[in-house]
Amino acid sequence: MPEALSAAQPASFQAKSRRLTRGEALVGLMLNLPAGIAYFLMLLLPSLATILLAFTDYELGALEWGWIGIANFEEMLEDRGFAIALRNTVIYVGLVTPLSILLGLGAALLIEAGMRGRALFRAVFFLPVVSLTVAMAAAWQYLLHPTIGPLNAFLRLLGVTSPPFWLSSSDWVLLSLGAIGVWENVGYNMVLFLAGLSAIPRELYQAAEVDGTKTWLDRFRLVTWPMLGPTTLFVLTITMIRSIRVFDTVAVLTQGGPNKASEVLLHTMYKEGFTFLRLGYSAAITLLFLLMVLGLVWLQTKALDKRVHYG
């Protein structure tokens, strides 16, 4: 039928339609050209440059450099500092991800349940997300100060004679940074879970009550949690990526110390590139970091995606 209508149209009309189609395509191309140029200059070009630098011995300011193949990656395997940074990053992600997801989900459930002051609590929980990380890190530096910090002052009131040195003790520094990371991510996760909760049809809860579901725990187990599957997968992926990218708090509060106890991948990458001026080695760490993030997203999507989407 469409072919018959097309054949019945005058040739002049078809030619005009083709001209309009070409004109619209040209206009669309011109409108997208600035964004395409910006995308190439700000994302693709730096990414390509990083990949190329990862296989060189280039140092910042040097006039000469050479191709060294995978020597930078071989050095990484033997670099004790890199191994420590990788281990600390894994521990940090393992601390921040589950705690911030559980607390974010708990906050979202309380707010969705209609608790009093829900707007205030929503703003308070979301405050760390919209605050400057460096400014918040400075505030945490005061709160965790071993002598004048409010936290240790409170512990002394409780009878703790020797409160921990939160940011200058190898035993406590990574836990302290992890607690700050949880605080930073809870509000963001809460908003995502609130969006997921609002999308659950109310009829499902009514049907569950008809089937004999009485307690909130049963409603959560049988309705809420299964229907939050896609949201939970997204929150898990985003939280792990945000955690593995930790840099600001480390740079402001500890600079990787004491004795590399809080050294993480991005801080190592920064030091190698802009302190030791070894841009080639820094680019190799950057490339490995990018591959880790992409691999993490791929594994989570492949392993969990089929289990949480319902058709």
Which residues does each PLM region occupy?
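Short, Lys/Arg-rich, polar N-terminal cytosolic tail immediately upstream
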Residues: 1-23
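A structural signal for multi-pass alpha-helical bundles of membrane permease subunits
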Residues: 27-311
